[in-house]
């Protein structure tokens, strides 16, 4: 896992890099999860599950619980979905992941396996009456180092089309922060939105954060899909 964290664009503290024996990162938030109280009757609790992009995001709404881990892939998120999402009793989960899958951070990852892992998380969420927001992959940029060698612009765009279709078919809300971050001609992230070519910088997160909040509001306001009660 140390290699996993080094392979991601930004290495953070122990809160975002699990120890080598904790492949799924269950120990990263395990003790924190145990201390979180059940939501109050009127609380609109939201859990944000993701990789580096989510781990580095900041939300000031106290009902938002960030469970992003740098270097993670969708199979790792699936393993910790019960602990880091279901056990916290949210109304909504925002799922963001896939860039590290196609980057080969934890082994080979394909468009198909990303969708399969998301489908499994969607099934778990529906079974526990949790509404789902599916986030797009963010663009990357070769402005500092070569990011598109492992994460080609065409592959990112194709996966996002698949994620949008998946969200539509399953009744999830699709969160598109790819479009406002991308330069249309090159299909790479606009230079003003990144310092390293992989993660958004402060200006990039200023674009992403309100889009996340808007998508959550949309999920809360929408009629619950069949099989969901909330």
Model-predicted segments: where are they?
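A short beta-strand-loop structural module common to alpha/beta enzyme folds
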Residues: 63-76
């Amino acid at each position: 896992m140390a290699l996993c964290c080094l392979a991601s664009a930004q290495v953070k503290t122990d809160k975002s890099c699990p120890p080598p024996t904790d492949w799924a990162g269950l120990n990263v938030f395990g003790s924190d999860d145990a201390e979180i109280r059940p939501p109050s009757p009127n609380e609109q609790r939201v859990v944000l599950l993701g990789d580096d992009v989510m781990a580095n995001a900041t939300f000031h709404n106290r009902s938002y619980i960030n469970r992003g881990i740098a270097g993670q892939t969708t199979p790792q998120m699936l393993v910790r979905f019960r602990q880091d999402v279901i056990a916290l009793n949210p109304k909504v989960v925002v799922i963001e992941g896939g860039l590290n899958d196609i980057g080969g951070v934890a082994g080979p990852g394909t468009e198909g396996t990303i969708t399969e892992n998301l489908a499994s998380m969607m099934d778990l969420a529906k079974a526990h009456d949790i509404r789902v927001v599916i986030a797009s992959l963010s663009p990357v940029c070769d402005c500092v180092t070569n990011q598109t060698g492992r994460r080609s612009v065409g592959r990112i765009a194709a996966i996002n089309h698949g994620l949008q279709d998946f969200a539509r078919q399953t009744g999830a809300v699709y969160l598109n922060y790819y479009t406002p971050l991308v330069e249309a001609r090159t299909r790479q992230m606009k230079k003003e939105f990144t310092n390293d070519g992989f993660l958004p910088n402060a200006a990039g997160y200023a674009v992403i954060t309100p889009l996340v909040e808007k998508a959550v509001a949309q999920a809360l306001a929408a009629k619950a899909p069949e099989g969901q009660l909330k």
